[in-house]
Design a protein with these regions (language model features):
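Bacterial N-terminal signal peptides
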Residues: 3-12
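Domain-level marker for long, solvent-exposed, non-transmembrane regions
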Residues: 16-192
Length: 192
């Protein structure tokens, strides 16, 4: 009989107690408002530098696609900065489709850029800075491109000079053919 009284009493007392199962864990998560990026990504060019710069950053689950998209973004910015000086036709297209992180959310990223730049040789674009970091299940790439107007002008001047030499040769051969033709006419008139 004592057993019937003590067991319910012990059970009722144990129901009022709390069980601690290890150190307390806070459910609060803290998020930073700042995004980590390389220092050079936001640095302004030196005042005496006449070059034009473009930066880009992109994310992808695929390493190479992350790099390609970041280069495309930097070129797009570079071209838009350059377009205030002139106008080239450049079409860029990038598509990514996939699962982000471990969730089931699908992301389709589609970008089309069309910048009109006519008769401009954009040779001389250099990748000045480059960095890839692991971010979640993918990769984030940061790129900084530099386009030196001075170097570009040297290249264009060399191309113009080469074309001028070719044009001079063409004119000289054309003039010689005309002279030869005129000489033949005179010879034919003397014979008739």
């Amino acid at each position: 009989l004592l057993c019937y009284i003590i067991i319910p009493f012990v059970i009722s007392l144990s129901a009022c107690s709390t069980i601690k199962d290890g150190p307390s864990v806070s459910e609060t998560k803290y998020f930073s408002n700042e995004v980590d990026y390389p220092k050079w990504y936001a640095d302004a060019p030196k005042k005496d530098d006449s070059a034009i710069y473009g930066v880009g950053t992109e994310y992808s689950n695929d390493f190479q696609f992350s790099v390609d998209k970041a280069m495309l973004s930097a070129k797009r910015e570079l071209a838009s900065n350059y377009s205030s000086y002139t106008s080239a036709m450049m079409k860029d297209f990038a598509v990514e489709s996939g699962v982000l992180g471990k969730g089931v959310a699908n992301a389709d990223i589609e970008r089309t850029t069309r910048l009109i730049v006519a008769k401009v040789n954009l040779v001389g674009v250099q990748r000045q800075n480059f960095m890839v970091v692991k971010e979640g299940s993918g990769f984030r790439t940061f790129v900084r491109l530099r386009f030196s107007a001075d170097e570009s002008n040297k290249i264009m001047l060399a191309e113009i000079q080469r074309n001028a030499a070719l044009y001079a040769q063409l004119r000289a051969s054309k003039s010689f053919r005309e002279l030869d033709k005129q000489t033949n006419k005179i010879e034919e008139q003397k014979i008739s």
